């Protein structure tokens, strides 16, 4: 049941104030702008929508669903299996480093909050412990998945405001324009079978790889 306490815990998890450092990464977006691939608000919006539909909804989100169920069932081996699967899906060193750093930061936080099993996975992906927190705080998977997509979207648009010449008001318009994409992404995450997971985006991988060697960067690599 999605009660007020669960709602408040979900709001805590998706808050930009969560001390995991997600704001420090652009997931290739910085190079895509610097390299001239994205020049306008419409370009950025289309890029973010494409990544959500063809990467987030086909890897991170469906794996989060599986890890959530594994935590519910107390099946640590399945948690570790899908955690490894998710980390193996990172196509560049930069993307893997980001997931590792966010996972370690969230692990440290959940341990300090005395959430059981937070230390079970040695190298947790962010989604692995996001799912654990959701199970512990009794946030239904449907709402947790929406929250996961929302915080990713918000972080991507926040990164874009530092890279593309549009202001905070335009950024809010982009978020609201892309918000309807969350529901179909969640639906896809629930229906994909195990052997359908892990779709890649070559342009995203190239942008991330080139960002690793970009001369001047605002975001971590």
UniProtKB/Swiss-Prot annotation:
Gene3D superfamilies, per database record: Urease accessory protein UreF
Keyword Chaperone: yes
One Pfam family here: UreF
Disulfide bonds: none
InterPro entries linked: UreF (IPR002639), UreF_sf (IPR038277)
GO molecular function: nickel cation binding
Chaperone recorded as keyword: yes
Domain of life of the native organism: Bacteria
Subcellular location: Cytoplasm
Gene Ontology, cellular component aspect: cytoplasm
Function: Required for maturation of urease via the functional incorporation of the urease nickel metallocenter.
Subunit structure, interactors included: UreD, UreF and UreG form a complex that acts as a GTP-hydrolysis-dependent molecular chaperone, activating the urease apoprotein by helping to assemble the nickel containing metallocenter of UreC. The UreE protein probably delivers the nickel.
Family in the record: Belongs to the UreF family.
Protein name, per record: Urease accessory protein UreF
Lineage: Bacteria, Pseudomonadati, Pseudomonadota, Gammaproteobacteria, Cellvibrionales
Name of the gene: ureF
């Amino acid at each position: 049941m999605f009660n007020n306490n669960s709602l408040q815990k979900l709001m805590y998890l998706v808050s930009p104030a969560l001390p995991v450092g997600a704001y420090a990464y652009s997931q290739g977006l910085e190079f895509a702008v610097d390299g001239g691939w994205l020049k306008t608000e419409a370009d950025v919006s289309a890029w973010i929508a494409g990544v959500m539909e063809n990467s987030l909804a086909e890897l991170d989100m469906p794996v989060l669903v599986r890890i959530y169920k594994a935590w519910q069932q107390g099946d640590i081996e399945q948690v570790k299996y899908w955690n490894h699967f998710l980390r193996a899906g990172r196509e560049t060193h930069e993307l893997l480093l980001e997931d590792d750093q966010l996972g370690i930061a969230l692990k440290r936080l959940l341990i300090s909050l005395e959430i059981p099993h937070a230390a079970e996975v040695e190298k947790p992906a962010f989604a692995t412990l996001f799912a654990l927190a959701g199970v512990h705080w009794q946030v239904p998977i449907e709402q947790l998945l929406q929250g996961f997509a929302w915080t990713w979207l918000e972080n991507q648009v926040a990164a874009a405001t530092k890279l593309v010449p549009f202001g905070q008001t335009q950024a809010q318009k982009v978020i609201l324009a892309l918000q309807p994409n969350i529901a179909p992404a969640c639906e896809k995450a629930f229906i994909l079978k195990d052997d359908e997971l892990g779709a890649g985006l070559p342009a995203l991988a190239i942008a991330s790889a080139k960002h690793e060697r970009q001369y001047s960067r605002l975001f971590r690599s």
